[in-house]
């Protein structure tokens, strides 16, 4: 079964495509150099990986196994794989088939032929994922009036996040304000200390756990200065949240 590439309008793909092998290898090497996470989709599931090596002379690249042995076995016999990576300000997509399992630095890994086509899409917007209701992910910091806040993260991307709060923050923030050293508690997914730049706020209607509609404030922020390590780790979190969401949807569909 062929896994189709997503997220790029068919009419626009040609302006993003790379067909030159040297250019494709350069992009793969850049993903390796920056330790960028890859989301690997196939007909039986998905897993998170990283490129370990690029070997143009053998027309191969090597990538890491996923964390679950069952998923690795499924991927090995799935046929075509669809790879998606999201380095800063861009999106990389390509298809490949696993050639075989190999040993790399003493550990098992997958190898595949270097793709004939690769899409490098420069983006102005980032993929945004809604966070789970439980456990709640939170941000803690200090507002310009020196009061401490603890707000719930509603959604998250490499570009920024949105926070929900019942607290009236009207007039406390103006567009462009930067809140320094905000503590992002992402539960099992880790802890980050970041700066947030205020974009805007709005009143929105949400449904609480009792099924009742409530009004709450939505505060939007962007990340003005993520370093490479923070960006890499945050991308890993976003991939993991997406994987968990997809698994949950699949379970509901099977009921």
From Swiss-Prot:
Subunit annotation: Monomer. Interacts with the flagellar basal bodies.
Record-stated family: Belongs to the YcgR family.
A GO MF term: cyclic-di-GMP binding
GO cellular component: bacterial-type flagellum basal body
Location(s), subcellular: Bacterial flagellum basal body
Main subcellular localisation: other
Name of the protein this chain belongs to: Flagellar brake protein YcgR
Domain PilZ: 122-240
Membrane spanning residue stretches: none
Function of the protein: Acts as a flagellar brake, regulating swimming and swarming in a bis-(3'-5') cyclic diguanylic acid (c-di-GMP)-dependent manner. Binds 1 c-di-GMP dimer per subunit. Increasing levels of c-di-GMP lead to decreased motility.
Record GO biological process: bacterial-type flagellum-dependent cell motility; regulation of bacterial-type flagellum-dependent cell motility by regulation of motor speed
Keyword list, A-Z: Bacterial flagellum, c-di-GMP, Nucleotide-binding
């Amino acid at each position: 079964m062929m896994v189709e590439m997503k997220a790029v309008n068919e009419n626009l793909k040609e302006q993003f495509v790379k067909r030159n092998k040297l250019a494709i290898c350069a992009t793969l090497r850049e993903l390796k150099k920056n330790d960028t996470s890859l989301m690997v989709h196939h007909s039986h599931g998905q897993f998170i990986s990283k490129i370990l090596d690029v070997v143009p002379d053998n027309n191969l690249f090597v990538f890491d196994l996923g964390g679950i042995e069952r998923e690795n076995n499924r991927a090995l016999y799935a046929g075509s794989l669809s790879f998606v990576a999201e380095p800063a300000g861009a999106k990389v997509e390509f298809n490949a088939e696993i050639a075989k399992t190999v040993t790399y630095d003493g550990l098992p890994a997958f190898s595949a032929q270097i793709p004939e086509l690769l899409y490098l899409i420069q983006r102005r917007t980032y993929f945004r994922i809604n966070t789970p209701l439980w456990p709640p992910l939170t941000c803690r910091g200090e507002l310009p009036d020196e009061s401490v806040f603890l707000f719930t993260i509603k959604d998250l991307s490499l570009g920024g996040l949105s926070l929900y709060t019942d607290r009236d923050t009207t007039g406390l923030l103006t567009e462009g304000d930067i809140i320094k050293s905000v503590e992002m508690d992402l539960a099992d997914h880790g802890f980050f200390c970041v700066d947030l730049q205020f974009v805007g706020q709005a009143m929105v209607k949400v449904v609480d756990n009792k099924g009742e509609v409530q009004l709450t404030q939505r505060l939007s922020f962007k990340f003005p200065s993520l370093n490479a390590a923070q960006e890499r780790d945050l991308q890993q979190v976003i991939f993991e949240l997406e994987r968990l969401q997809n698994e949950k949807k699949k379970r509901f569909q099977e009921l």
